[in-house]
Amino acid sequence: MSSEFESNTTENPIDNTAVISADSDTTQTNTADSNNADKKEEPLIHCDNLVKIYKTSDIEVMALQGLDFDVHKGELIAIIGKSGSGKSTLLNILGGLEKPTAGYIMFDGDMISEISQKELCEIRSNKIGYVWQKNTDNLLQYLTAVQNVEMPLLFSNLSKKEREQMAKEALDKVGLSEKYNSFPTSMSGGEQQRVAIAAAIVKKPELLLMDEPTGAVDKRTSDNLQQLFRKLNKETGITIIIVTHDISLADNVDRVVMISDGKISSERILKERYNSIKNENGSLADGIGGNTENSEDESTHEEFMILDKAGRVRLSPEMQEAAGINSNRVRIEVEDGKIVIRSEDE
């Protein structure tokens, strides 16, 4: 391959990403993906080219811009990003609370972006648990812990005794065996969150979604909750997705997904899990690009940039500044099998 890399690089007016086309490399990648397709387990969640646009009479806001995302059973994932990046919108779509404007989402074999409202309600009720940031959104203050956890079971065919037993078992799992008859007003913020988690898992869902679960507690309580997330994930096998601003969660999850401008821009994968995936499949999941360095997370996670279906990769402002890139023109070459991006002045 020539040292001069003939590429098609354009500026994206929406997210200022570079489009890099390398036909020979793409052919090899597609062949590898095809060879490994049979080896890969079907994901629990598959998001394809998700777009979400919010409209008012005078303005349109694009919250998601062609986002692709897969989640496999048993994963523990944190989704991080700045306010307005699209992470909460993604969580709402994953939970069936909103539908995408374009694209589709598969959950456990069902295309939940297309099914009826009745079918969607059944999936939300039986397969998905939710924990919100505000305890007032999770709990009824005039009910005891057991009564709060029983609430999701009220429309089941279980007897009162069976519901109470299941609620107590869920509270045991989150470490609140001594708080069965306590009211939320007598509990700490961390204890209230544990009750909310117990209510979310009492029906043994396949997926647990949490929106800023550590956002309203102190660091010690946050650390304890993070240990609980890991414990539940390991002991029950439940898939957990957490939207958060709390960067400390990175060391306690399998995968950290960074969302920027409505797209996934990078991922950090726990090294142990990354090596396992690589050994089993011979390649990583679709969309993972090259390695980048991160001194804070170097000992625990591998970090990757995300190459989307159009061949685009987003360079963060920090990367551009470090490389001396201060315009929308860059030089791209292939050197020893590596794509090198330089500023136009070099």
Pin down the residues of each PLM region:
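Conserved ABC ATPase signature
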Residues: 183-187, 191
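A short, proline-enriched helix->beta-strand linker immediately N-terminal to the Walker B motif
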Residues: 202-206
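Catalytic Walker B motif of ABC-type/P-loop ATPase nucleotide-binding domains
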Residues: 208-211
